Amino acid sequence: MSRPTLAQSSQPNNVYTTLADVRNALQIEDSLDDNDIQAAILAASRMIDEYCQRSFYQEGTLAAPVIKYYTPVSPWYLEIDDLIEPTEVRSRANQSGPFTQVWNLDTDIMYEPVNNPEIGMPVTRLLAIQTYVFPYFFPQTVKITGVWGFKAIPYEVELACKIQASRLFVRKQSPFGIAGSVELGTVRLNSRLDPDVEMLLKTYRRNFGLAY
């Protein structure tokens, strides 16, 4: 596999900061290290996903929604991935049957946290509120179609990604594990997330839903 070049890709997909922001943090004015900085941005973004057990980019659109399947562990509630815009919820009675049961918002199910959409946050849980219950005896019995992730990347995530990407880039140039810049200060580098990054991301951590 050939290494991506600037001509092929000036910015990786699904990342949480920009080349310009990291350049500025590192006080780099030329483009000689752009590919390495982009690799650091991509790695930092995926480290953030892993730490938070969620992704902050958007999957799908209303015109082309994404389908995910879930295995309920309770008849009354279902933990799901971050959902921005649900378009359809269906269930089936067993593992191999068709998804014939359609769930309607406010009559069959509620989305929680209920106030999240008003503040630009996704919903993460479904509640069964009427006669239907989630079929939890078999795996992958709930099918949800919609737009997933976050409408906009939270500011704390953007800042965390810039800090972590800067550290990853500087790390390869610092064999003794110590580096510094005017903006970052003197730092001891290691393979973990920066403590400030962890603090920024703390409120965004969650337990991951059972999607397949």
What label would you give each PLM region?
Residues M1-Y212:
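Divalent metal-cofactor coordination and adjacent catalytic microenvironments
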